[in-house]
Regions:
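Beta-loop-alpha module in the N-terminal Rossmann-like domain of NAD(P)-dependent dehydrogenases
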Residues: 55-77
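N-terminal Rossmann-like dinucleotide-binding module
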Residues: 1-52
Length: 77
């Protein structure tokens, strides 16, 4: 991930998927990357993280917001 802006995504639905796709493109340029995702369902968060190659998956929004590695949070709920 290097020096990219690490983005946390709140939510794991269609809008969140669009953002993850855009972040994967930005990661190629070293600008930003999808680093974490949070969903009320741990299973859904893990599935989303696997699909979009995201490092961390949380089952609560508070956990993601508390992660010191997250630079920016995108709210997709």
């Amino acid at each position: 991930m290097g020096n990219c802006l690490k983005v946390g995504i709140l939510g794991a639905g269609n809008i969140a998927g669009s953002m993850a796709e855009a972040l994967n493109e930005l990661q190629k340029e070293g600008k930003a990357c999808a680093y974490a995702v949070a969903s009320r369902s741990q299973e859904k968060a893990l599935e989303f993280a696997r699909k979009w190659n995201i490092t961390r998956a949380y089952s609560s929004y508070e956990e993601l917001a508390s992660d010191p590695e997250v630079d920016l949070i995108y709210i997709a709920t």
